[in-house]
């Protein structure tokens, strides 16, 4: 019977590692297959995106968009996540929840610019939520379960609708 410590590849099926820079007799001595001098002969990797002086692709492409310094980022909470926290005993049924309570319950990690309630999943427990914004479907689902949603400040998408 073959033992695990006696396993070895078949004779001739693998090639040994080429040791470069070990004299002219090895066939890979002196410059070790790197050619002569220059940037690519040196140690380290070639510069990413460098195309030998030709204008690189990333600089030929047009610039687009900008970073809005006033952009708002929300901590998103889905209905299934709230239901999961209730089942785990982290949130009591009928509890009043705001951003601080959601952080304490471990539903979100941080508030960012506000909490946004989204409608993914189902909710069966009545909860009183106070959030920065919420989708219409999420509000309907919470109210259908016997809870309520208080939106403190409407998001842009809801204000336009």
From Swiss-Prot:
Ribonucleoprotein among keywords: yes
Record-level GO BP terms: translation
SUPFAM superfamilies reported in the protein's UniProt record: Ribosomal proteins L15p and L18e
Disulfide bonds: none
GO CC, one annotated term: cytosolic large ribosomal subunit
One MF annotation (Gene Ontology) recorded for this entry: rRNA binding
Bias kind Gly residues: ranges: 22-36
Annotated region (Disordered), positions in chain: 1-39
Keywords assigned by UniProt, alphabetized: Ribonucleoprotein, Ribosomal protein, RNA-binding, rRNA-binding
UniProt family annotation: Belongs to the universal ribosomal protein uL15 family.
Functional note: Binds to the 23S rRNA.
Subunit structure: Part of the 50S ribosomal subunit.
Name listed for the protein in its UniProt record: Large ribosomal subunit protein uL15
């Amino acid at each position: 019977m073959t033992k695990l410590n006696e396993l070895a590849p078949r004779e001739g099926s693998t090639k040994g590692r080429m040791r470069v820079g070990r004299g002219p007799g090895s066939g890979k001595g002196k410059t070790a297959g790197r050619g002569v001098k220059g940037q690519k002969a040196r140690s380290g990797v070639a510069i990413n995106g460098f195309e030998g002086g030709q204008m690189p692709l990333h600089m030929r492409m047009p610039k687009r968009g900008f970073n809005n310094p006033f952009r708002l980022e929300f901590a998103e909470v889905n209905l299934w996540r709230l239901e999961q926290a209730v089942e785990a005993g982290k949130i009591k049924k009928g509890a009043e929840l705001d951003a601080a309570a959601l952080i304490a319950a471990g539903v979100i990690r941080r508030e960012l610019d506000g909490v946004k309630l989204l409608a993914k999943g189902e909710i069966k427990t009545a909860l009183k939520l106070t959030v920065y914004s919420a989708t219409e479907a999420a509000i309907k689902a919470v109210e259908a379960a016997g809870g309520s949603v208080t939106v403190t400040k409407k998001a842009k998408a809801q204000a336009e609708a």
